[in-house]
Amino acid sequence: MKFEAVVRTELGKGASRRLRHAGKFPAVVYGGEEAAVAIVLNHDDIVNQMDKPEFYEGIVLVIDGKEVKVKPQDVQRHAFKPKVEHMDFIRI
């Protein structure tokens, strides 16, 4: 599975809320030798694939044209809506 991601330029609560209202959500990629990277993902693209076991075995994120193989580490969901608030990915 391959997903497009964009590096976040605005950080903080207000910027995250604006992303969620626009149908996206914040995430972070960390691990390995490289520094952690804050990214933005399209909500519907990710949520539609989360029910498949392959999603949790490893996916490819295309971050500014560079392919990074990652595995979902943590998912923060909304309390009562079927929405993802934030995700953590670890490089593999």
Swiss-Prot record:
The keyword Iron does not apply. Pfam families: Ribosomal_L25p. One of its GO terms (cellular component) is cytosolic large ribosomal subunit. It comes from the Bacteria. CDD domains: Ribosomal_L25_TL5_CTC. GO terms for biological process: translation. GO terms for molecular function: 5S rRNA binding; structural constituent of ribosome. Keywords: Ribonucleoprotein, Ribosomal protein, RNA-binding, rRNA-binding. The keyword rRNA-binding applies. Part of the 50S ribosomal subunit; part of the 5S rRNA/L5/L18/L25 subcomplex. Contacts the 5S rRNA. Binds to the 5S rRNA independently of L5 and L18. This is one of the proteins that binds to the 5S RNA in the ribosome where it forms part of the central protuberance. Belongs to the bacterial ribosomal protein bL25 family. This is Large ribosomal subunit protein bL25.
